[in-house]
Amino acid sequence: MINPSTKVSTKVLDKKYNFKIEYKLIKNKDLLKSRLSEIPKSSGCYLFKDIDNNLLYIGKSKTLRNRVSSYFNNYAELSPRLSLMVRQITEIEIIVTDSEYEALNLESNLIKTNKPYFNILLKDDKKYPYLCITWSEQYPRIFITRKRRNRNNFDRYYGPYVDVGLLRKTLFIIKKIFPLRQRPRPVYKDRTCLNYSIGRCPGVCQEIISSEDYKKTMKQVSMIFQGRNDDLEVFLERKMNQYSNDLEFENAAKIRDQISGLKLLTESQKISIPDSSINRDIFGIVSENNISSIQIFQMRSGKLIGRIGYTQKIDNSDETEILQRVLEEHYINVEGVEIPSEILLQFNLPKHNTIEEWLSELRQKKVKLIIPKRNKKFETVEMVLKNAKLELERILNGIQDNESSIEDLTQILELTNQPRRIEGYDISHIQGTDPVASQVVFIDGIPSKQNYRKYKIKDPNIFIGHSDDFASIYEVIYRRFKKWSKFKIDGGDISSLQDKKKSTLENDLLTDWPDLIMIDGGKGQLNAALKALTQLDLHEEVNICSLAKKNEEIFIPGFSKSLDTDQNQKGLLLLRRVRDEAHRFALSFHRNKRSARMNRSQLSQIPGLGPSRIKDLLEHFNSIDAIRIASREELSKVKGLGMHSANDIYNYFNEL
C-alpha cells in the first residue's frame, strides 16, 4: 500500500491510472501499444509492478508518456539491469502532478517509503563500506557493513565511505567517547561482561539502562555522521553546565570527557579550507570506458568530515543525468538537517532549478547549487575531481586485469564465448560426517556473494565412516541443473540463454545460467559432474572443467590428461580464486553444521528432550553455553518446557 507523506494536493493524487494485466507487457506488443497510448503527456510519477504486485521501480518525468514508452521502444539499448526489470513489468501505475517540482517531491517520498529494488541506482557493489545504526532494535547497534540491501526501513545507513581506515578509526574513537552496545548478543545470560565494568557499555544485556535513555545516546552519536559535530558540542556543553549547576560533578566529568574526545575526533579530520562558517557538499564525476566515478566531499565548518564514493555504469546516459540522479538519491536518504547550505558542482544539472527548490524544501532553508569558475571553491571542486579520477583509474585497472584473466581462460579452455559467470563447486565433510557442498559465483571475475548457495547432501549412502565425493558432486550438479533440463524437455532453447540481454525468458532461468562451471577436484570429480549433466541431457550445452589441488591441473571432458598451462597464467589464477573461494565457503558451512549437530547431540543426552524441544532451546538461547549457565526460571520460560524439564536440564549441566 503506497501512502507517501507528500505535499501534492488531493486533486493531483486523484488523477490516477491503473493498468493491470495478467502477464508481462513486453510479451504482448498490441496490449503494450494500447496501454502506452493511454498514459497522459503531463508531468508526474510512474510505478512499475510485477505479477505479484511488488514495486519494481518508481520514476518521474515532465512528459510521462514519452518517458515510460522509452523503456519499451528502446528495449534493446537498455542496460542488463533495466532490461531485466522491463521483462518483469505487468502493471504500470501513473500519478499525475501539476508541476515537475511536485513530481520530484512525490518521487522522493515514494522511494523513501517503498524502497523499490530497481531504484537503487547506486547499487550495493560492496566496493565501499557503510556505517549502519539499527534503529529497528530496542538497543540499536552501530557497525560497519558493506551490505545495504534488505535493510529494515527504520535502520539508517551512512556512506558509502571511500576511506575505510578513517571510518574504522572514527568508530573506534566514538566507542571510547560514548558508552555503547558492543556485541550483537550478550556473553552471559545473567550478568554483565567486562565492557560494562570498564564503562564501555551501559549494561544493555541486563537492561541496566532503559531503551529510551540508550537511544538518546545513540542520537548524539548519529549527529557525528550527520556532520553536526558543532551542534553536538554545544548540546554537550549545555548538559555539562546543567550537571555542574545541579552539583552532579561525576556526570559533569563524564560529559567533559566526551567533549574532549569529540574535539580530538574533529581535529583528526585533516583537510580544511577557508570559509569555515559555511557547510557544503562538493560533487564530482569523471567517466571513461562507460564507467563513472562519483565522489562527494562533505565539508562542515571547514573540515572534511566525510568522503563518499560511488561507481556507476553510464548505460547511454550523459554525466549530467548521472550526477543529478546520484544527487537525488543521496539526499533522499538523509534528514533535512544534514543538507548543507551550499552544494558545489562542476556543471549545471538538467533540472538545476527544480533540484535547488526541492533541496530547499527538504532543508526548510535556502540551498544553493553553485558552479564555481574561479577562487577557492573552484579549487575545491578540482580536488574532488582529481580524487574521482584516481579512483576511476584504480577501478579500470582492476577491470582490465579481470578482463585479461577472462580472455586468457577463454583461450585455455577453447570456449566459444567468454565466461562472464563462473560457478565453482566443492564438497566438505569429515569421514562422511555432515556432508555439504558449496556453489560460489564469480561475475566478470568478481565474487557475487548474493548468488552463493549451500547444499546439504541428501544421499542416504553417505554417512559417518562412508564418504563419497563423486556421489556428492553428482547430486549437487543434478539438483542445480534440473530446472534447465525441464525447460529443454518442454521445448525451450538452451542457446537463447547465452544472450541474456535480448532474451524474454523468466529471470531465474536466464540470470542463473553459468557460462562455465568449475569442480574442485580431479578427473573423477569432473566425470561425476559430467554424468549428472549427461542424464539431464545438458552435457553439450554446459561448459565444465575441474581444477585439482595437487599440481593445479585443469581437466576438461574428452581428455584423459590435464591441460598444459603455465602456473602463472592469468586464466589459471582466476580459476584458483574460484576454487579457493568454493573451498572456504563449503568448509565454513560444514563447520557450522557440525557445531549445530554437536550442540543437539549433547542436549539429546538429557532425558525427556526430543528434537522439537532441543530446537526450541537453541532458538531461545542461541548457544549451548547460554543454556549451560541459565537458571531454572530462565529455562522454564522456553516454549513448551515446564519446570520439571527445566530442572532436568539445570541438574544435567550443574551435576546435581
Swiss-Prot record:
Residues in GIY-YIG domain copies: 41-120
Boundaries of every UVR domain copy: 230-265
Record Pfam families: GIY-YIG, HHH_2, UVR, UvrC_RNaseH, UvrC_RNaseH_dom
Listed InterPro entries: DisA/LigA_HHH, GIY-YIG_endonuc, GIY-YIG_endonuc_sf, GIY-YIG_UvrC_Cho, Hlx-hairpin-Hlx_DNA-bd_motif, RuvA_2-like, UVR_dom, UVR_dom_sf
Domain of life: Bacteria
Gene Ontology MF term list: DNA binding; excinuclease ABC activity
Keyword tags: Cytoplasm, DNA damage, DNA excision, DNA repair, Excision nuclease, SOS response
GO biological process: nucleotide-excision repair; SOS response
Subcellular location: Cytoplasm
GO cellular component: cytoplasm; excinuclease repair complex
Subunit composition and interactions: Interacts with UvrB in an incision complex.
Function: The UvrABC repair system catalyzes the recognition and processing of DNA lesions. UvrC both incises the 5' and 3' sides of the lesion. The N-terminal half is responsible for the 3' incision and the C-terminal half is responsible for the 5' incision.
Family the UniProt entry places it in: Belongs to the UvrC family.
Protein name as it appears in the record: UvrABC system protein C
